[in-house]
Each structure stands twice: as structure tokens, then as C-alpha cells.
């Protein structure tokens, strides 16, 4: 007996017409079924057919690479192939199609992507993959390449990435690379890419209002470095470059001691005119300065990058490897990659997008080793050793060089000073200080390097003396003394003023703070910290001076406090480090993208 047929789907019993949506409840309609795996399964089968060379109707050829494929698949995924196979071009009927603009391996990767939606972008292939994806109009691949390059932005490569993005019409990447270069200007100008820029590109960069710089001297020194890189050819551009350096914004001392003495300025009448303009600006009363409006008197208005404070190693109570960061925006601490080995009493700087931990004590020996930390990769790497072993040294960056100042080598305090050139990965000695100084604090203001206080092992005294180093003359000169002896003082620079924070004189641990103004060659007292600290880290960020950890003479401190010069008050940060640390290295970095 035959089974009677079922009534047609979605019809009333005994009726053959579909339901009228106007008459019936929509909820009774049959749902539309969508199988999310259907397309994926179909492409998987098509890729299997391709790998077996089944049903393929075209062979794509690049160099000596032959790639069987299906026209309909290529045309469906690539507008380039769609135009080729659906138009009147000879390739629409050809069994073999040669692509001359792309190498074989890259084309194979892109055809694989068409079938699988999978691709791996690396440092090695991105420069050929992106233009090839652009040619085949595979916009998703091009976007992936741009996102990869954006994640790789670094002071040493951002100018090259910017040029690459410009060449291949990657507008978003171009803008981001340009912004990155502006925000990291002080480190970018130390790169080979900057030194190899053309004059138009240099002028475009240094004329930007968005440069993130601590002082206009960064721009002046960048110009001098660029010209000296190929002096015979480039010195004719000095006047054109100096037009974009905002000399009136520089301190008078820097104008007289550095700019006026620069041979490249002396040899250009136009440059001397810019210098005279700047000097006149400084001679005017404040009210009249406001009326002297020009591009060179306009303050730059950079976009503020989010900052992190990095605290490296330290004594807790023995030398440790731990590294932690404080996020100012999120107001919290987090751990990052540890040091390769234990280290305390080290010098610490941020230069060329890297954090450098210089010398120090590993728990048994004073060391001359140096490690650099890449915040983007969260990775430490060893660089060239110093010439001398140093702990309790001072470290600072001046004119693109890292200086290691004084310290203790295990037997005696040091007056020697050495500098590190990141480009050659080499250390070399410069003029020694006039006094041996261990537990010395250092800072850079107005193109001069200051060594503050410390301990003189020869006289067995904590020091109140201060001396400054002029790199052009390669000499150290005493300046005004502090009001008190300070060894292990934290030293920081804020608003072109030099701060000496805490420290000790023998058993007495201080909470007092004094500040030095280079324009008056005088120290003055400001508000005391909330607690006594010596061997603490100091850094300036967002107009505030932060003091981190240290010890109070009896225990290591995990607390942090900051000084506001506007209110002359210290405030304790609510969030503490995970452990108390003294002799830790502290610096501020740009938060990685």
C-alpha cells in the first residue's frame, strides 16, 4: 500500500497555495535556515580539488612557479582576477596566465589565501606581500599587512614604515607612522633612518607643532646631527632648517653656550639672524613677548602619549630581577619581563625606545654589564659592556649618548665618566669629574649634565658639591653647592629645574628637597617629602615629580609620592609597588601601542 504524500510544506491541509503573510501570524512562517559551515566546507573541498589539480581551468604563472586554480574562485575573491576573467582580455580565455609583477612564492601565498582565508604575515614577507595584495586587490590581506606594520612601529623603523606606507597608498598606516614619529621624536632622531632622510622630509618633520619634546634643544641638536652626517652636501641647508627651529623657546644659557658657539650657525648669516631674533625675544618684558608672534615663538602642542613608570631590579633586601610598571592612567602596577640576572644600584635611562640598565651590583660583584629592554617585545637584550665596573653610578642621556657617571667599583669611588654610542654599540671615556662620587645623582638641563652630591671615599664624606659637564668643551665645572650634604639623593628634572630629593648624611636620612635653577646658579628649599628616603628613584611626568621606593634607614619602601610645583605639596600615591625596593632603577617610557 502506498503512503500518501505529505502536504506541501508551509501550506494548510488540503490547500496548495502558500500562506498569505498578511493573513497569517508571522510566527507561523517557516524559518530560513543558514548553515554557517557551508561556505567553509565548500572552499575546503575546492582547495582539495585544486591540490589534486582537478577541475582546474587556469594555471597562474609567476617566475618559475605554476599554480593551478579555478577561474570562478579567483574571480569571486579578487577584483583583479574578476576583471581579467570576465572581460574581453585575452587572459579570459587563456589556459596559462603569467603575472609579472609578483614573485612566485608570494603569489602562491595569496592564491592559498583565496582558498583558505589563512595567511601569515612576518617581518620577512610583509614588504612583498603588501604590494602584491594591493595589485590583486585583496584588501583584507593589505589591511592585515598594515596592522602588522603598525604593531612593529619603533623609533628605529617608523620613518621607513612611513615612506613604505606612502609609496603603497596606505593612508591610515601613513598617518599612524607619522604620528608615531612626532610622538617619539627624541628617539627617532637617533636612528639611521632620520640621518638618511631628504631635506624636504626633515623640514616637514621638524616644522610639526605636534612634536613631543622635553625642550626645543632636541630639535636643534637633531638638525646639527643631520647636517653633520653629510656636512659637505648638507651645510647649505642650515638656514632652511633653522627656520623651523624655535630658538626663542630655548633657555638663554643654551643659546649663548651652545647655539652661538656652533660652527654651522656661525658660518650662516641667516642662522645668526635667527639667533639674534631669539636673544631679542629674551630681552623683552613678558607682556611684549606676547606681542612678538611668529612660527618660532609658538609653543608646540604635542598629543600626550600615555606613560608608564618602569622600576627595574633593586635591593629587596638582596639584589633582585623583578621589573614592574606603573600605569599612570589606570593607576595600577603590573609585572613585565624580568632582568636576565639580578641587579641593584644600577644606572637607568630611556633612550631610542629602549630602557637601559647600566652596571650595578648582582649580589656578589660590581658589574660592567648593560642590558636593554624593549617595551614592545617585552624582552631584555645584552649590549656592549662598560669599560669599568660601576655600582651606585648615575646615568643620563645627553645629545644622543648614554653617560655613566662615577660610582663604586668594589674598592674605590670613581671620578671617571664614560659614554655609550648606541649606533656603534661602543663605550668610550670622556673627561673625569673633579671629585670621586659614588651614590651620585645626575640630571640634564639646558644641554649640560649635572652630577649632584654623592659620597667621596677618599675623604669619607657625603658631598654637598655639584659639578656640570659641557660635552662640547669636554670639561667638568663646579657650580653652586647644595645647602646640605646628600649621598644617595634622588635627582630629577622638571620644568628646566634640577631637583635633589632626600638622600643621607651619614646616619641621617633626609626628607628635605632642594631645587637648582641654572639661570640664577642657586639652590632653594621646597616642601619636604612625607617620609625620609635615600637611594630612591626619581622621574618627572605630566608636570609632577615622582619619588619611588628607597629606604628610610631601617627598611625598604614600596610607597611612591609625587611633588606638584604649583602647590608646593607632596602627595602619596595610593597604589604601592609589590615589594619594597631601594637602589632600583626608575624611568618613564611611552606606553607600547
Curated annotation (Swiss-Prot):
GO MF term list: actin binding; protein homodimerization activity; ubiquitin-like ligase-substrate adaptor activity
Record SUPFAM superfamilies: Kelch motif, POZ domain
Domain of life of the organism encoding this protein: Eukaryota
InterPro entries in the cross-refs: BACK, BTB-kelch_protein, BTB/POZ_dom, Kelch-typ_b-propeller, Kelch_1, KLHL2_BTB/POZ, SKP1/BTB/POZ_sf
Sequence ranges of Basic and acidic residues compositional bias: 17-29
Region Disordered, annotated ranges: 1-29
One GO-annotated biological process of the protein: protein ubiquitination
Signal peptide per UniProt: none
Entries under PROSITE patterns matching the protein: BTB (PS50097)
Kelch repeat segments: 308-353, 354-400, 402-447, 449-496, 497-543, 545-591
Pathway where it operates: Protein modification; protein ubiquitination
Assigned GO CC terms: actin cytoskeleton; Cul3-RING ubiquitin ligase complex; cytoplasm; cytosol; lamellipodium; ruffle; stress fiber
The keyword Nucleotidyltransferase is assigned to this record: no
Subcellular location: Cytoplasm, Cytoskeleton; Cell projection, Ruffle; Cell projection; Cell projection, Lamellipodium
CDD domains: BACK_KLHL2_Mayven (cd18512), BTB_POZ_KLHL2_Mayven (cd18338)
BTB domain residues: 56-123
Entry keyword Cytoplasm: yes
Keywords, sorted A to Z: Actin-binding, Cell projection, Cytoplasm, Cytoskeleton, Kelch repeat, Repeat, Ubl conjugation pathway
Function: Substrate-specific adapter of a BCR (BTB-CUL3-RBX1) E3 ubiquitin ligase complex that mediates the ubiquitination of target proteins, such as NPTXR, WNK1, WNK3 and WNK4, leading most often to their proteasomal degradation. The BCR(KLHL2) complex catalyzes ubiquitination and degradation of NPTXR. Responsible for degradative ubiquitination of the WNK kinases WNK1, WNK3 and WNK4. Plays a role in the reorganization of the actin cytoskeleton. Promotes growth of cell projections in oligodendrocyte precursors.
Assembly mode: Component of the BCR(KLHL2) E3 ubiquitin ligase complex, at least composed of CUL3 and KLHL2 and RBX1. Binds actin. Interacts with KLHL12. Interacts (via N-terminus) with FYN (via SH3 domain).
The protein's name: Kelch-like protein 2
Organism of origin: Mus musculus
Lineage, broadest ranks: Eukaryota, Metazoa, Chordata, Craniata, Vertebrata
Encoding gene (name): Klhl2
